[in-house]
Amino acid sequence: MSEFKRIPPEHAQALREQGAVVVDIRDQPTYAAGHITGAQHVDNVNIADFIRAADLDAPVIVACYHGNSSQSAAAYLVSQGFSDVYSLDGGFELWRTTYPAEISSGNSQ
């Protein structure tokens, strides 16, 4: 894949069930208040560490607030060599109404 794909929550959930990595690019306090279960918080401070440790061929879903900022972040990951990248349409706001049982809080990643 040379570009990322925009996907709805249902497609993202199917990918999660197959082991996709979810990264949440919202600010740390917002992430801690509630995020997709299993999502890793990634920001400008830890993005280099995330990239170094990542399997570039594993599917990665990028989530933000509403699905806008995640598109830029997904494009950046593709530019860094990731081959299977998705942007969550509707972001966390749509996710939490679609899958309220798939939300965690706190800083655990």
Swiss-Prot record:
Record: active site: C64 (cysteine persulfide intermediate)
Descriptive protein name: Thiosulfate sulfurtransferase GlpE
Root EC class: transferase
NCBIfam families (UniProt xref): PRK00162.1
Gene name as annotated: glpE
Gene3D superfamilies: Rhodanese-like domain
Domain Rhodanese intervals: 16-104
Reactions listed under catalytic activity: thiosulfate + hydrogen cyanide = thiocyanate + sulfite + 2 H(+); thiosulfate + [thioredoxin]-dithiol = [thioredoxin]-disulfide + hydrogen sulfide + sulfite + 2 H(+)
Main location as per UniProt: cytoplasm
Family, per entry: Belongs to the GlpE family.
MF annotations from Gene Ontology: thiosulfate-cyanide sulfurtransferase activity
CC per GO annotation: cytoplasm
Function: Transferase that catalyzes the transfer of sulfur from thiosulfate to thiophilic acceptors such as cyanide or dithiols. May function in a CysM-independent thiosulfate assimilation pathway by catalyzing the conversion of thiosulfate to sulfite, which can then be used for L-cysteine biosynthesis.
SMART domains: RHOD
Localization per record: Cytoplasm
Xref: InterPro entries: GlpE_sulfurtransferase, Rhodanese-like_dom, Rhodanese-like_dom_sf, Thiosulf_sulfurTrfase
Classification of source organism: Bacteria, Pseudomonadati, Pseudomonadota, Gammaproteobacteria, Pseudomonadales
Keywords, ordered alphabetically: Cytoplasm, Transferase
GO aspect biological process, one term: glycerol metabolic process
